Amino acid sequence: MEASSGSSPPHSQENPPEHGGDMGGAPAEEIGGEAADDFMFAEDTFPSLPDFPCLSSPSSSTFSSNSSSNSSSAYTNTAGRAGGEPSEPASAGEGFDALDDIDQLLDFASLSMPWDSEPFPGVSMMLENAMSAPPQPVGDGMSEEKAVPEGTTGGEEACMDASEGEELPRFFMEWLTSNRENISAEDLRGIRLRRSTIEAAAARLGGGRQGTMQLLKLILTWVQNHHLQRKRPRDVMEEEAGLHVQLPSPVANPPGYEFPAGGQDMAAGGGTSWMPHQQAFTPPAAYGGDAVYPSAAGQQYSFHQGPSTSSVVVNSQPFSPPPVGDMHGANMAWPQQYVPFPPPGASTGSYPMPQPFSPGFGGQYAGAGAGHLSVAPQRMAGVEASATKEARKKRMARQRRLSCLQQQRSQQLSLGQIQTSVHLQEPSPRSTHSGPVTPSAGGWGFWSPSSQQQVQNPLSKSNSSRAPPSSLEAAAAAPQTKPAPAGARQDDIHHRLAAASDKRQGAKADKNLRFLLQKVLKQSDVGSLGRIVLPKKEAEVHLPELKTRDGISIPMEDIGTSRVWNMRYRFWPNNKSRMYLLENTGEFVRSNELQEGDFIVIYSDVKSGKYLIRGVKVRPPPAQEQGSGSSGGGKHRPLCPAGPERAAAAGAPEDAVVDGVSGACKGRSPEGVRRVRQQGAGAMSQMAVSI
């Protein structure tokens, strides 16, 4: 119907509805009088669509109104029940009088829904066209409509007594068939209208067949726009979720806030109309606009900084999320593209770095925060036939990388110590104000802290005072001030000075040597088997990798005799581990007169790549040689030298060191001799490593 030019404007335009700031209020609060009682809304979500039963029954559609005609009753059953608004039975005392002001109903059609920012233009135009038409009687053209459209969805039998030519039932069935996937009978029963409201609205819309048709279209349009859209977001979300599983979004949900994941949660917040997500990019709030943060499904949620109670706007429609903690940028780790701009006067270091990916994606895409995908290939372990070999190769390669760096640092530190000791021996006026340079105990060397302490303690205890010695000569001159029995300590100092000079000479000749490993020999290593068991960790890191248990042949040059020994390096399987051996070592052990407690050191030439071996023999203390010619005493009687200093030196475990250190008695048990040799091996290993 078309509005005449001279008709008065509709009531919805004369008295425009007042839109409050809070759009979350119910429509019933905005309608006064009986209109608040006439409209009842069901906010439950729609289930899956079953087949339509007959939408009306004689028992449920019985009315006790005497004021309504048969035609209006038939219309109520037709438009109310079939249109999805089953009339609510009421007692005769209530009555079904028309609305005092039917304009309230029409205003309601033009009101903005709490989930909608603007009214639907189709509904407003329909109302304007209907109100501009001249009114007609309510019952005109309705006497012949006596049947109630009852039907099942799509092709099934329709329970209707009206003829096929009737426009109203046919229009409703076409609408019902087109929306069969999104609506059910239970959904339609959730919205109720009184008979008086239907009659008054039909009369206001022109009455008769046209008024009834206009009212039915109005109701169905409202149902379709505000209720059928509730289920569509859920379907769209499922489809987009399936797409995102194959090709995930490069930007994940911020880990500090969760948006509604489906259409059901969004409908609970107000039944928003679903629209496809837009690809437009909105700059962050720090640059003057509303910060837009895409969700995992691809929709954009803009955060308004204004004082409005609705803080989230979904597709230009207000949405109130559940209350959460402070959503300021300092407390949340947004993706890197949307890191909030620091406020004026604040340092950029106060903001925490954002997480590279959202926890919701399980860490599968490490580059999600950076805007691109980078999936690391970590399936190489399953390609190998044996996981043990693969793990061993990785471990050995990792240990080699770490050991190379530690070896370089150790060599630099050793050379620095040697140069420092050389400079300290030269007389300088500043030598009295300088102290000894000692390396930090941060794991630079490959010897244990106990052996390092054993090497450093004789130097520190060689001086009776606690003041640190400024040079090796000062340390050697200090014991000379003591009585004659302290000559053993003087011998110890001479041995240390000789070792230091040998070390300086060896550093010049062997500066290209790299220390690999050392091994204190056991009884089985020096026996008739002719093989030496090597430490596993050092062998895997520094020696060549073995493919088979037969091993490889390695020529090793003896540093002491310059003789090349052809030894075989192999391993024995030990459960899931390995035991590395160095075979054909019997001749080398006999030529160097190595015994249990002695040790070997293996080097590698940095330039040529060849391997060198050195056998270090732990010599017995000279005190045992001096006491071997004395008389008296039993077999195990300790022949300690006389004198309080010698006795104190013999009783102090710190002074009982190798290479000519006095204080050891002749009658030591085999366990004591073995312990002394092991201590001497630790001291000699420190010298070997420093070279």
From Swiss-Prot:
Source organism, top-level taxon: Eukaryota
Compositionally biased intervals (Acidic residues): 31-41
SUPFAM superfamilies: DNA-binding pseudobarrel domain
Gene Ontology CC annotations of this record: cytoplasm; nucleus
UniProt feature, compositional bias: Low complexity: 56-73, 402-419, 460-488, 642-661
Tissue: Seed.
Region annotation (Disordered) ranges: 1-95, 135-158, 384-489, 618-691
Main function: Transcriptional activator specifically required for expression of the maturation program in the seed development. Probably potentiates the response to the seed-specific hormone abscisic acid (ABA). May bind to DNA indirectly.
Source organism of this protein record: Zea mays
Keywords tagged on the record: Abscisic acid signaling pathway, Activator, Cytoplasm, Developmental protein, DNA-binding, Nucleus, Transcription, Transcription regulation
Compositional bias annotation for Polar residues: 1-15, 420-437, 448-459
A Pfam family annotated for this UniProt entry: B3
InterPro entries membership: B3_DNA-bd, DNA-bd_pseudobarrel_sf, LEC2-like
Amino acid composition bias (Basic residues), ranges on this chain: 391-401
UniProt DNA-binding residue ranges: 517-619
Region annotated Transcriptional activation, chain positions: 1-121
Localization per record: Cytoplasm; Nucleus
Matches recorded under Gene3D superfamilies: DNA-binding pseudobarrel domain
Record protein name field: Regulatory protein viviparous-1
SMART domains (alphabetical): B3
Principal localisation: cytoplasm
Key word Transcription regulation present: yes
Record flagged with keyword Metal-binding: no
Molecular function GO terms recorded: DNA binding; DNA-binding transcription factor activity
GO biological process entries: abscisic acid-activated signaling pathway
